[in-house]
Every structure is written in structure tokens, then in C-alpha cells.
Amino acid sequence: MYKIAFDVMGSDNGSAVAIEAASRFIKSRKDLYLVFVGDEDQIKTSLEKFPIDESRFEILATKEFIDMNGSIMDIRRKKDSSMVRALETLKDKKVDAMITGGNSAAFIAGSHFILGELNGISRPGFMPTLPTAVSNKLTLLLDVGANLEADIEDIIGYAKMANIYAKNVLKIENPLIAQLNIGEEKSKGTLLQKEIYKELESDENINFFGNLESRDILAGKVDIIVTDGYTGNMCLKAFEGASKILMTEIKSQLYKTIFTKLKALTLKKSFDNVSKKFDYKNHSGAILLGVEGIAFKAHGSSDVKSFEATLRMTCDAVENDVLNKIKKELN
């Protein structure tokens, strides 16, 4: 039985959405036990509407939560916040993993102060899973914003940790790893990127593809893409925004006139398949790689679908024991 602490406070859409997602998801996982962390009254009210078998959950009541406008200092100030308590349950090994949809900066700071980093890692990285144009193929991208800067050791660490994750969770035998850059040529990029290229190329344990341009992130050419958090975050948000706008525009054009509506009926299945594949909500959530625990960050604006995706990814990480395997690799 896997035990996951779920901080249901602090996200944009409130605790009810998180509870609804949990209620739907837990039906498909008989091996899952949830610890809901947050305002007890709100949680109980939501559970009345979205019931869960009482043997499958417990409530860890807190009096505070860190909202999106909070600061990293709230980790120190709000000792009884849902995020802090969820992180503490993970540190104390009372749960196997934790999830929050709350303030990203506070989550990163809390993970640093409460969980601490793994041996050899100074800057953890957020790693989401992205869809690609290749059927049934996903790509891992990191860092997407845990840290704005990264040095050579950070990027090499990201590559090593993501390599273990891809092998065990995505079941890829020999993951292909690329560095995000402004061109494919070895000579492209900053001095730092050129040095990173040399390090990745010379590492016998890394199956290095070379440089990858941002236009090919979703092409399915590689399994893992490493970059600094500033660049990665911009790429991720560009994908999310473009995906949303493109799907909305296609739908608008298909339902513009009676003629196009009739035509749309013949294309509905194909459109639904593409829409489902590239809807970022189906891949929402990012693991914070490099900390002493399996900690996932759901999107701040998560809806039910997004939270379900994060729950699924968290269960996969726990089930495949990625933390211990990453620690073994780093040591």
C-alpha cells in the first residue's frame, strides 16, 4: 500500500477540486492510501460531495496554508501550514511521497529546508513529462523553474537523475539525452553550454544525442532534455499556451458554420485523439528531482484532470522506487 500526503490547499481552484480528483483517481488504485493535509472542515465538506472509502484516507488538519501570493519566508513563519506539514510527513517517512499545488517558490524553499538535497546535488530541478509527435513516446524536460541558473555539475546531475527515472518509470532501456540549445552544432551556444556538451559527450553512462533546438522538443527525437530552469520554464509555458490556443482555434474554425460543423463530425475522433495527446493537463505535474524524498508539484491552476495526472505520476514514481535508485546512482 502506497501512502501519499496530498496538500489540498493553496492552489488557485481550491481544495474541492483536489478532493474530487483524489476521489476519482483512487478508484483505479487499490494500493493507494491518501493523507489529506489542510483545513479539516473544507476537506470534510468536499468529501461529502466526493466520497472516498474511509479506510483509504486520513486527514492531517492544519490551521494555515501558503497562498500563491506568499513568500519563501512563509515556510518559516507558517509552521502549521499544509505545505510544511506535508513535507514534514515525508521527511519523517510517514508517507512515501507528497503532492502540492501551492506556491512554487515556497515549495522549493520548503523542500530545501525540510527535506534537504541528495548527495552531490546542490540545485534540484523540476521535471515534467511532455507528449511528443511519436506515438506512445514521452519526453522528460528539466529544469523547468526550480532554479533560474545552473552550472555544469547541475546539468550533469539532472541528466543522471532523469536517466534513472526514464529507465525505471518510462521503461526506456537506454534513454537518449539532449542539451537544449540554439542550434544542433557542437559549436553553438554559450561557453557554459559548450562545456556541458563536452561533459555529457564524454560520460560513458549517458547516451548523448547532442544539442536539440526548442522547435524539436515535442518531435520525439530524444527521451530527456536538460537545460537551466529559466530556459526550461519559458519553453514549458510556451508549449502550454500554444497548445491551449491552437486547440481553441481549431475548435472555433470547425464549428464556425453549419457546413463546417457537419464536416467536423467526420473529424471528431481524430481531433479528440490529437487534443487528448497534446493537452498539457493530461501530463500535469513535475517531480522535484534532487531532494531527499519523492515530492511532486501540481500546476497552480490545476483542475480535476490535472490533479489526477499528478497523482498518477506520483504513484508511478513510488511504485518504481525511483528515489532509492537515483540515490544509488549518485553515490
UniProtKB/Swiss-Prot annotation:
Keyword Lipid biosynthesis: yes
InterPro entries the record matches: FA_synthesis, Phospholipid_synth_PlsX-like
Subcellular location(s) per record: Cytoplasm
Gene Ontology terms: cellular component: cytoplasm
Catalytic activity field: a fatty acyl-[ACP] + phosphate = an acyl phosphate + holo-[ACP]
Keywords for this protein: Cytoplasm, Lipid biosynthesis, Lipid metabolism, Phospholipid biosynthesis, Phospholipid metabolism, Transferase
E.C. no: 2.3.1.274
Protein name: Phosphate acyltransferase
